[in-house]
Amino acid sequence: MTLLSRVLGLVRDVVIAHLIGAGAAADVFLFANRIPNFLRRLFAEGAFSQAFVPVLAEYQQSGDMNKTREFIGKVSGTLGGLVSIVTILAMVGSPHVAALFGMGWFTDWMNDGPDAHKFEQASLLLKITFPYLWFVTFVAFSGAVLNTIGKFGVMSFSPVLLNIAMIATALFLAPQMDNPDLALAIGIFLGGLLQFLFQIPFMKQAGLLVKPKWAWRDEGVTKIRKLMIPALFGVSVSQINLLLDTVIASFLMTGSISWLYYSDRLLEFPLGLFGIAISTVILPTLARHHVNREGDSAKSAVDFRNTMDWGVRMIFLLGVPAAIGIAVLAQPMLLTLFMRGNFMLNDVYAASYSLRAFNAGLLSFMLIKILANGYYARQDTKTPVKIGIIAMVSNMGFNLLAIPFSYVGLAIASAMSATLNAYLLYRGLAKADVYHFSRKSAVFFVKVLLAAIAMGAAVWYYVPEINQWAKMDFFMRVYWLVWLIVLAAIVYGATLILLGVRKHHLLTKN
């Protein structure tokens, strides 16, 4: 399901690139899309799940189903009330949101500059896209509940509906409107609604669809609140950094936001397919091991450490070849996927520079998802917050140092900040004797790196020059790209086998 969602996400971006390219309209829509997208990552893949799942695991561990159902109702009611207020305020105050995150456009609007129209259009689009916050909050809530009972497929499939809605509005509604970016914003709203409605039958089938109830002072809700407030910052530092990049990009040349977006989206494919998916799967297991520590603390600690180590090994296995593959195939991938309609060859070149810069931090972005779980499963949110503050402040400093590199400098700064974040998260776990990078995993990493280098060399040898790619028709580009990816997989897999990697190296309790 996750693979289907990511593939459709790429199809959606291909359609968007064809429709609005990388010009002013694209910058405005992608700006308006980034806010709910940030909130999706924050809630669906971030702070809420990190705070809610461990507490829910405690209620489920008690074996009292009625108490668990009552807890779910109180959380949904309290969360729903708060998010409703925030959503309404954001819709009414959308010009203020646009001014905050699009300061460059707002400055032009105040001074009748050339980008004044971007600020006005962004304010309008935010009114349409912000209700997505309300929908995605409940999607994240129900998805977290279903994940704890082993129904991972429901949450994995939900983003498919968002992608379908956006593709449909781009193909059928946009041609009927003067502003195609407005149709895309409507697609975000409809996608959120479909995701929300899709979850309801599964919650009912599981016997967990209960009446929401406001319970701000409830013991369980209070515990989640205390865990979530710092986690909101700690788990989403990379996303906050991207928002800060958006603010700075609004001062740069037209196209900067679009080039950064398309770069980020290509990077999101392996990050979402591997990093977030693995993180989502291991969090309930880690939380369970932590809860079970009262029965057999020594065994629980070992199980916790083994689960963490397995997650890190999987990130190495999938993330290292993904990073090297993207570095070699950055321009061919961008050209094959996006160069049509309003997306030109110069956009391919521009986006490839920021893609390679972002890609330098891919492994760190993925490791953050795993390492952060080592804290949140133990209900420790303070440490990631401290680390997050350091990483975010560092990102601001890196941005200043990278000013000469324009929008590419923003991507470089994000990669450097993510690497620092991942290192500090690991160091904290090691100091607390929660998780140490095992010797077997170190040997495994070396083998993975050697295999990935061999893979990258083989692909680099056979890949055609970019001018040759530009002259190919679409189907020939796809043929070459698929062939190179298959070649990469064969070389990578064969080299791993030659280096002695076997199935038992991939098991949790290796």
Swiss-Prot record:
Q: Which Pfam families match?
A: MurJ
Where it sits in the cell: the answer is: Cell inner membrane
Task: Give GO terms: molecular function aspect only.
Answer: lipid-linked peptidoglycan transporter activity
- Keyword match Cell membrane: yes
GO CC: one term?
A: plasma membrane
Cystine crosslinks:
none
Q: In which pathway does it act?
A: Cell wall biogenesis; peptidoglycan biosynthesis
Task: Report the superkingdom from the record.
Answer: Bacteria
Q: Does the keyword Lipid metabolism apply?
A: no
Per the UniProt record, which residue ranges are transmembrane?
Answer: 13-33, 81-101, 130-150, 154-174, 182-202, 240-260, 266-286, 315-335, 357-377, 396-416, 443-463, 481-501
The way this protein sits in the membrane is described as: Multi-pass membrane protein
Q: Which GO terms describe its biological process?
A: cell wall organization; lipid translocation; lipid-linked peptidoglycan transport; peptidoglycan biosynthetic process; regulation of cell shape
Keyword terms, alphabetized: Cell inner membrane, Cell membrane, Cell shape, Cell wall biogenesis/degradation, Membrane, Peptidoglycan synthesis, Transmembrane, Transmembrane helix, Transport
**Record's PANTHER family?**
LIPID II FLIPPASE MURJ
Function of the protein: Involved in peptidoglycan biosynthesis. Transports lipid-linked peptidoglycan precursors from the inner to the outer leaflet of the cytoplasmic membrane.
The record's HAMAP family line, in alphabetical order, gives: MurJ_MviN
Family designation: Belongs to the MurJ/MviN family.
What name is this protein filed under?
Probable lipid II flippase MurJ
Gene name of the record = murJ
